[in-house]
Curated annotation (Swiss-Prot):
Function field: Alpha-1,2-mannosyltransferase that catalyzes the transfer of the fourth mannose, via an alpha-1,2 bond, from a dolichol-phosphate-mannose (Dol-P-Man) to an alpha-D-Man-(1->2)-alpha-D-Man-(1->6)-2-PEtn-alpha-D-Man-(1->4)-alpha-D-GlcN-(1->6)-(1-radyl,2-acyl-sn-glycero-3-phospho)-2-acyl-inositol (also termed H6) intermediate and participates in the twelfth step of the glycosylphosphatidylinositol-anchor biosynthesis. The presence of a fourth mannose in GPI is facultative, suggesting that it only exists in some tissues.
Keywords: Endoplasmic reticulum, Glycosyltransferase, GPI-anchor biosynthesis, Membrane, Transferase, Transmembrane, Transmembrane helix
EC number: 2.4.1.-
Protein name in the entry: GPI alpha-1,2-mannosyltransferase 4
Family per similarity comment: Belongs to the glycosyltransferase 22 family. PIGZ subfamily.
InterPro entries recorded: GPI_mannosylTrfase
Length: 579
């Protein structure tokens, strides 16, 4: 037999193994290096979660799961978003309960029964849910390991691209509903691919176990209740599942397979509806069924509601977000799609348009399948005017499979490494990077022991930052002498007026009165001057580096000056009395 071009002599002939050639050793060394690289990046994924990451990507990471569950499970002070009020009920609560809720329940149980009290802290509340998502993210690695050979992809190159992507390191280790959507989409691909054979003549597969169809239907229903946009990702694999082995794929075969999926989907939907109805009901209201996906669609299909969250051009996903998340891999996918389109146009000129665009030609090869898995959801999501980059993170798995073919090396390796290093630095460290450490610092301040004779009231005012997740302060829900005020991107005059109103509270005006009032302002270095204009003396100031706010970016001249560190820091200023 042949190994890397060097023959192995026959033992029966009495010959020994020939020395492997230099090309073979290079290939073996390269494969081993890729495996070591994947192992190192996997370790980095876990360690960086524990460190923890300081970057604050988007408020939805906190306010669609841990902020709500911390209030429900631990009874701490939190800012509940409108989606989780019974009057709105736009988000299903089952996945937040399973991810953040289970983590917080274990923390509460440990604090009540464990030998070391005081385990619950801002750090534990931050890292606990993230660590669970990080563990679940390795299901992506297992899926790529399983999917790569039948998809014509190099297994270890695909795993290296997956583990080295900053999307995996940053987004798949956080409590976004998009993260759950990506995990469910990947498991859907595994179930479908294991029941499909590729080739010029696809034979109808033998009937699989009934649990597989039930599980497939359950995943589709769970994905829909998590985010109704999951259907955009599921349409291609479900079509492949419904037409596998069919001589004439059409409505009949799709309907037959849809009925097979129905029991699992119905059972899963019943669990979600029961959980949501229980969660959003109260003794004062009638116990009606709560259908959170219906409420979600009713809200988001209204253009005026979407406009409140920002409107984007229809090509934002294709022209901007794809490059922002995946860099050169998105460019490779565009190139592959263009080449496939050219082949299709040539075929249509020779055979006719209808035959060339038939289902058999669209899904005739794994590469065509991967292209559809990537571009079909992207096109469907582009129909909506609100387009954020994180909506595309479920596309990572089909993309890395598409960009790591067995017959070719991964191109642009240096560019891929540099792009993901910069992405991890920006979104994992710099972007709003001082806010989470700032909350940890303020947690220590407000929980510091004070003299019983002089109780202290704290006012924590945040301006020009993302919404502060209040559960990280670990404040009791009732009676906490701490007031958290989120001013958002307020004007300078409104900031000064608000500060004056806090310092003129009766308890703060009485010299030697019953309360000692401490006022803290949290602001980026680029907007610190607005606080100075309010004529309050600075009692002390703490800088947390790095912190980059793209809404108020530092000027280039300030970055080139000696004060660049101040402009790239979050400032926590304790104010004295107004002068």
């Amino acid at each position: 037999m042949q190994i890397c071009g060097s023959s192995v002599a026959s033992v029966a002939a009495g010959t020994s193994f020939q020395v492997l050639g230099p090309v073979c050793w290079q290939q073996l060394d390269l494969k081993m290096a890729v495996r070591v690289l994947w192992g190192g990046l996997s370790l980095l994924r876990v360690l960086w979660c524990l460190l923890p990451q300081t970057g604050y990507v988007h408020p939805d990471e906190f306010f669609q799961s841990p902020e709500v569950m911390a209030e429900d499970i631990l009874g701490v002070q939190a800012a509940r978003p409108w989606e989780f009020y019974p009057s709105s009920s736009c988000r299903s609560v089952l996945f937040p309960l399973l991810i953040s809720g289970s983590t917080f329940w274990l923390l509460r149980l440990w604090e009540e029964l464990g030998p070391w009290p005081g385990l619950v802290s801002g750090y534990a509340l931050l890292v606990g849910p993230r660590l669970l998502l990080t563990a679940l993210s390795f299901a992506l690695d297992g899926a790529v390991y399983h999917l790569a050979p039948p998809m014509g992809a190099d297994r270890w190159n695909a795993l290296a691209l997956l583990s080295g992507s900053y999307v995996t390191l940053v987004f798949y280790t956080r409590t976004f509903s998009n993260t759950i959507e990506g995990l469910l989409f990947t498991w859907l691909l595994v179930l479908v691919s294991s029941h499909v054979t590729w080739g010029p003549t696809r034979k109808e597969p033998a009937p699989g176990p009934r649990w597989r169809s039930w599980l497939l239907g359950g995943i589709v229903a769970a994905g829909f209740f998590n985010r109704p946009t999951f259907l955009a990702f599921a349409v291609v694999p479900l079509y492949l599942w419904g037409t596998r082995g069919a001589t004439n794929p059409g409505l009949k075969s799709l309907t037959r397979e849809a009925l097979v999926l129905l029991p699992g989907a119905a059972l899963t939907a019943a669990v979600f509806v029961a959980t949501d109805s229980w969660y959003f009901s109260s003794p004062a209201t009638s116990r009606n069924l709560v259908l959170t996906p219906v409420n979600f669609l009713h809200y988001n299909l209204n253009p005026q509601n979407l406009a409140r969250h920002g409107t984007h051009a229809r090509l934002t996903h294709l022209a901007v977000n794809g490059f922002l998340l995946f860099g050169v891999l998105h460019a490779q996918a565009l190139q592959a799609a263009w080449q496939r389109l050219q082949v299709g146009l040539q075929a249509s000129a020779q055979m006719g348009l209808l035959r060339a665009l038939g289902a058999r030609s669209l899904l005739s090869s794994p590469r065509s399948y991967l292209l559809l898995l990537y571009f079909m959801p992207l096109a469907l999501l582009s129909a909506f005017s609100h387009q954020e980059a994180r909506f595309l993170i479920p596309l990572l798995v089909p993309l890395v499979l598409l960009c790591s073919p067995q017959t070719q090396p991964v191109p642009w390796k240096g560019t891929v490494v540099l792009f993901n290093a910069l992405g991890a630095l920006l979104f994992g460290c710099l972007h709003q990077g001082g806010l989470v450490p700032g909350l940890e610092y303020l947690e220590q301040v407000v929980h510091a022991p004070v003299l019983p004779s002089t109780p202290t009231h704290y006012t924590l005012l945040f301006t020009h930052t993302y919404m502060p997740p209040r559960h990280l302060l670990h404040l009791p829900g009732l009676g906490a002498p701490v007031e958290v005020v989120d001013m958002g991107g307020t004007e300078d005059w409104a900031l000064c007026q608000t500060l004056k109103s806090f310092t003129r509270q009766p308890a703060c005006q009485v010299a030697g009165g019953p309360w000692l009032c401490r006022l803290f302002v949290v602001t980026p270095g680029t907007t610190r001057r607005a606080v100075e204009k309010c004529s309050f003396p600075f009692k002390n100031e703490t800088l947390l580096f790095p912190h980059l706010t793209l809404e108020d970016p530092p000027a280039l001249s300030s970055l080139l000056s000696g004060a660049w560190r101040d402009h790239l820091s979050l400032h926590i200023v304790e104010l004295g009395e107004e002068t």
